Amino acid sequence: AIRAASGLSPLAMDGGLSAAADARCESFVAGGAFDHSGMTTRSEICAAGPIGSASSVCSYWQNSPAHYANITNASFTSMGVACWFCSTAEGQYTYWTVTFN
């Protein structure tokens, strides 16, 4: 819906990009740096914390200029998605990653 509102085509789901997103979430859960230094795709957006739903994290990304720019980048044609849940010292966390190409 976000891309359509900007006059853009929807992104196709890509299994390879989803595998890359999954690997990023796994790295975060294992204690890897929560940044974009390990990115292996053209672009990615990530979120972490006690975020309980996909709609909550999507609202966050939509209201963040940098994340919104990735979602509405006209050069992207495909995406992959992953989400991992884990227990931390701060409580239950969810790690979300969307990769783009």
Question: Predicted segments — roles?
Answer:
Residues 1-101:
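Functional surface patches built around histidine and acidic residues
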